Amino acid sequence: MGYAIAEAALTEGHHVTLISGPAFVQPPRNANLIPVSTSDEMFEAVHRDADKCDICVLCAAVADYKPANVSSTKIKKRGAKFSLELIPTRDILDSLGHKQDRQFVLIGFAAETEHVEENAVKKLRAKHCDIIIANDVSGADSGMESDVNEVTILFRNGEKTKLSRAPKKNIARELVKIFSNFATKMFDKKNVTIN
């Protein structure tokens, strides 16, 4: 969804910074691409650029855990079993949501396999997002590895909007309109203009 949203935003005339891990899809040509390889690089890049944004959309499926120790050499086989210690990665969405001086609209994604809306609302509140996009990724025909999606957009004021199953490019165009309208209303209250 990230690349589709970036493309839709560019089509609408927005300036787009795309912070992306390795992907099989070509990034939009006119986006300012910042390539990253690890969750730590993603965290640092997002924090470096977030305050330059009017709208910050976090839809990358960043791993929740990473190896505690990284080996620069091959780990030799030592027996039948091997345990790998994992530690939590830094939570990018949570850290941005809790910034005291945040001036941008914060939009997160909740890819869920059960209790989709309920879990998304919890994430919206816990991470202090303005909007969260909930999508059910339990089926093979929708979500991350599919060209189609259907989503529920949940707003911090309790409102929600559903976008029915459609190609991701269509969903992305609708999301960009919703994000822009939300930001315009929010910034109008603060007497600020979005670029």
Predicted regions and their residues:
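Structural motif
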Residues: 15-17, 32-33, 54-56, 104-108, ...
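Glycine-rich phosphate-binding loop
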Residues: 38-110, 114-141
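Catalytic-loop motifs flanking and including active-site residues across diverse enzymes
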Residues: 1-2, 88, 92, 171
